[in-house]
Amino acid sequence: MAVTYEQIRNFMQGYFIGYSEDCQLPDRQHVMDKYYSPDIAFDAGFSGRDFWYRICLSHPTWQDKVEPKRLCIDVENLTVSAMVTATFIERSTGRILQQIGMNAFYSLSVDDRGDLKISRLDVFLESNLEKVQTMMKYLRG
């Protein structure tokens, strides 16, 4: 069965909600198994869903909420380009710590069950050095 534009759009919409709400919570994180392939690769040079999950849990005091602004879906090549805003929110107060724009490029695959999965993620950050440095400060703890 061929993958449709609507399937990819719905998959990505669910993904952004899931990442923002579930991926960074230890008891909810594996809800994201429906989005990430077990061997997902990242442009940062690491791979594997479990490794990515550990990274997502490495900042328990703040939440990373990702909101898509524009999606460009290529059905034929199973790719999605997304302009997103990432907002880092302090969990205890709800205070916004940082917002940064990103362009994310998702390569998708279809697993043995016929389900879409993200198999590769490349992220390109906004070219504001101050925002990038602040983001890295929060990521490093």
Residue ranges and their predicted role:
Residues M12-Y19, Y36, W52, C56, ...:
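Hydrophobic alpha-helical core bundles mediating ligand binding, dimerization, or RNAP-core interactions
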Residues L25-M83:
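A solvent-exposed, acidic/Ser-Thr-rich amphipathic alpha-helical stretch
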Residues M1-H30, K34, P38:
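Short, low-complexity N-terminal intrinsically disordered segments enriched in polar/charged residues
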Residues P60-G141:
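A beta-strand edge to alpha-helix "cap/lid" segment located at domain peripheries
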Residues A2, G14, G18, G45-G48, ...:
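Residue-identity detector for glycine
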Residues Q7, V31, F51, K131-T134:
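Exposed alpha-helical structural elements
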